[in-house]
């Protein structure tokens, strides 16, 4: 693992800043698709892209599951100078993702229309959803491999290389989106293909690194060892569940809003979901950027270093959380009008109010994500999974359904505020338990 040798704080800033930037750029993939589809087609096509997001979230969650678990274990192996084991794990994980991607592509294309209905498509959005899935599904392997290699490049000590690769992929997506939608008139299908090709471009860039001499670990012949996943999957489960829960909550929110408010409510939530994805990914960037460092110091049994990294991460959240909330609160009208340029004044006004209420949750969610990610880095999967499932699905879905049933449709916009607050209580309890155990070992 390539460290600067200057200070722990310097390494933290170097890793986290690059990871946060790459996470923001990665979230722009769906935002660019949605924005260009809204302008180039219509707002219902944009809603269809939002309906398809749970599918891409599912792909991303699988990628995160294997990437975080394997990178954590590889980092520990490297800290323990077990280079051969690190190479074998890297190679096995890569082969597994190729197989999973091929299977997912085949199943989705075989059951395309039922899958579109499962995502929440109706008579208005069915064709749009099918077109988007048809364009993105063949690139499932690229989705899985791309993020896995990105995390491993950062684990190898080259976060800037990963950042520039992600930026290059995003720029490719923007250019191809524009060409496909506005020049080739390919609509939603063109937006999906553009996104898939950009993922392929990032994969190729990462391969250049892993076949270079500067790479610490590389592909090699290996004997498949299923027992490795007994360690990989529990470690990566927390972050994987965090990503999967994002997709599941978008799915559940779409269903609930459609039932309680109607189609305009889904359009409103689509705008909120795009911006919230950026906020969440920024916090995930803080978490995942510090994880390789925390795992490295944990492997060396440096508990003081681990606690410093946690303090740095939480301090970063304290800076970014209120800044993001204020930014969204005051610029909500401009953001909403950008996406709903063809909508009526009533829908725009309603969306601005809903957006501002929802954005209060931005003050809390980062703390839960960082604490859960830290538990992952130090091989405490049970607290990490509890936090991830709690904030991402269990508490949020329960609060959503309860508020909708008691107070009606408009109350759903308060859902994340209450669910994140409840989860924060649980996170702080787990954190207190960890600190007590660490103090006893000192």
Predicted regions and their residues:
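N-terminal transmembrane alpha-helices
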Residues: 3-41, 54-69, 73, 98-105, ...
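Small-residue-rich hydrophobic transmembrane alpha-helices
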Residues: 46-106, 143-162, 268-332, 365-387
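Short alpha-helical transmembrane segments in multi-pass integral membrane proteins
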Residues: 1-19, 74-141, 183-237, 294-361, ...
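Small-residue hotspots at the loop-to-helix junctions and early N-terminal turns
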Residues: 43-54, 129, 133, 192, ...
